[in-house]
């Protein structure tokens, strides 16, 4: 807890905003038994962190990929995100895109769609809930 309040005005709270990538207990399994941390990349085996055998036992884990997903996508470690007033709403955007930006020199925009239009969103929210 870093003092970020997220449950104001119906905004998502921290237990639901960040995706499965950074949750150590969450995996997605494809039909061939490959395990992924993100459902957006399911089927792309270069992102698989492990594979289940026919008995359902996890085979060797790709610790490099797993560690990147669990630890490298922290938006609080990003100077831009850590200073952004929208961080409590978006939590840094998509962790997979953040990891691709860091390790594969991609240039995905991870900012929330609310950035730049939050005042309008709040006005609409208040007008609908008054």
What residue spans do the PLM features occupy?
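Functionally constrained cores in energy, signaling, and assembly domains
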Residues: 22, 53, 96-100
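Detector for glycine-centered tight turns/loop "hinges" at secondary-structure junctions
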Residues: 33, 56, 101-103
């Amino acid at each position: 807890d870093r003092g970020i309040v997220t449950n104001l005005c119906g905004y998502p709270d921290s237990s639901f905003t960040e995706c499965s990538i950074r949750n150590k207990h969450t995996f997605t399994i494809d039909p061939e038994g490959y395990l992924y941390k993100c459902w957006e990349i399911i089927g792309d085996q270069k992102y698989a962190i492990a594979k289940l055998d026919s008995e359902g036992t996890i085979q060797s884990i790709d610790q490099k990929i797993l560690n990147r997903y669990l630890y490298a996508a922290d938006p609080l470690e990003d100077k831009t995100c850590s200073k952004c007033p929208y961080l409590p709403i978006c939590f840094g955007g998509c962790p997979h895109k953040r990891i691709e930006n860091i390790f594969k020199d991609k240039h995905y925009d991870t900012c929330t769609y609310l950035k730049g239009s939050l005042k309008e969103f709040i006005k609409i929210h208040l007008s609908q809930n008054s």
